[in-house]
């Protein structure tokens, strides 16, 4: 594969994202013996990224590095209970990284003009889910939940009072 390799991902005849030379990587950690795989998808100028589950950070994820692992960090940390390796783009598509391992994302930062994601393992499976119609973000989210499963509606009693020790009043 040469330096001119390009993969264009299109929907309705229009390019929504893509991958170029050096968009796929393999990294071996000599200290731990672990292998990590990474992929990068292009971002257009002005394209915003949303999602990645529960975060105590700005809603727009551009410029953020997000490491996904479960942890009890409270509200003063970036650790969260509900990590979801799925993001939506303002261009009307979503990306789901299908990995049971800890997944790291770097979203359009000073170092990356793309969304880069990586995980430990010998393979890295991800889905680019194009939205369609009048509301492509809603459609992409619906297609994502069709792929991964939709939750049942919790019982009415579960919507009651919620107490926390993280805040004082």
Model region roles, listed by residue range:
Residues 156-160:
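Structural preference for beta-strand elements that scaffold enzyme active sites
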Residues 1-154, 164-166:
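Catalytic and substrate-binding clefts that recognize carbohydrates or anionic sugar/phosphate headgroups
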């Amino acid at each position: 594969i040469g330096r001119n390799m390009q993969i264009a991902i299109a929907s309705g005849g229009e390019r929504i994202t893509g991958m170029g030379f050096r968009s796929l990587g393999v990294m071996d950690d000599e200290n731990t013996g672990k292998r990590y795989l990474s992929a990068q998808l292009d971002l257009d100028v002005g394209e915003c990224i949303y999602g990645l589950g529960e975060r105590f950070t700005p809603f727009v994820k551009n410029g953020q590095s997000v490491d996904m692992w479960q942890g009890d960090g409270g509200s003063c940390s970036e650790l969260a209970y509900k990590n979801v390796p799925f993001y939506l783009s303002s261009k009307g598509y979503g990306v789901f990284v299908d990995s049971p391992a800890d997944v790291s994302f770097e979203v359009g930062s000073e170092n990356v003009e793309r969304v880069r994601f990586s995980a430990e393992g010998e393979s890295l499976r991800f889905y680019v889910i194009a939205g369609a119609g009048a509301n492509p973000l809603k459609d992409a989210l619906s297609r994502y939940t069709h792929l991964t499963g939709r939750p049942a509606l919790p019982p009415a009693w579960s919507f009651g009072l919620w107490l926390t020790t993280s805040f004082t009043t």
